[in-house]
A protein has these predicted regions:
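Structured C-terminal cap/extension of enzyme domains
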Residues: 79, 100-176
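Structural preference for beta-strand elements that scaffold enzyme active sites
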Residues: 24-29, 58-63, 83-86, 110-114, ...
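Acidic, His- and aromatic-enriched active-site or binding-groove loops in soluble protein domains
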Residues: 82-96, 140-141
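Active-site mouth loops of central-metabolism enzymes
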Residues: 1-8, 36-39, 132-143
């Protein structure tokens, strides 16, 4: 992180508002929460800072993106009155990081959940192993690998939004 003090956090936040040309941010996300970076969050009182900014009307909703194991996810989700979370989830990584268990826990707490990496960095968007193709070919519904990956994530009622990176118009159309 670029901040090395509580004062730096204030400066960085004000610079973000300036770059966005706004007086407030609707959804402010602490990125890359994990056990190592969480120490920084605690050391520099980041949660107190964000609470203050919310009270001032400069932040509307506070959330975090998570990159650690499920046990740490349980700790973080109970440390603050979060308003949304972002986790990695796809049909290969259902037990990776927060995983499906984290998704379910966030849902139990009534938190909107944003999913990142539904295509595992594009690896689930291309050719599948023959065994997978064989199973999919037997399905009544015919879908592309991208459609299967999105459908798997979207079928969880706890999922609010699915993010997907794209580098071409064709990928954009396929993601819709």
């Amino acid at each position: 992180w670029l901040a090395r003090s509580e004062e730096d956090i204030e400066k960085i936040f004000n610079k973000q508002l300036e770059r966005l040309q706004t007086d407030y941010i609707d959804m402010y996300l602490i990125h890359n929460v994990g056990s190592k970076l969480w120490k920084f969050t605690e050391k520099y009182n980041v949660l107190d800072f964000l609470t203050k900014k919310k009270e001032e009307g400069k932040i509307r909703h506070i959330g975090f993106s998570f990159h650690d194991d499920y046990e740490f996810f349980k700790e973080v989700i109970d440390k603050f009155p979060w308003e949304f979370v972002q986790i990695q989830l796809n049909y290969i990584d259902e037990n990776f990081q927060a995983g499906v268990k984290g998704l379910k826990l966030a849902g139990e707490k009534g938190l909107p959940v944003i999913i990142m990496e539904p295509l595992k960095g594009g690896r689930l968007a291309s050719t599948m192993p023959p065994a997978v193709d064989e199973i999919w070919s037997q399905m009544k519904e015919k879908r592309t690998p991208v459609e299967w990956a999105f459908r798997w994530v979207a079928d969880f009622p706890e999922v609010t939004t699915i993010l997907s990176g794209m580098s071409s118009y064709a990928q954009l159309e396929n993601n819709l």
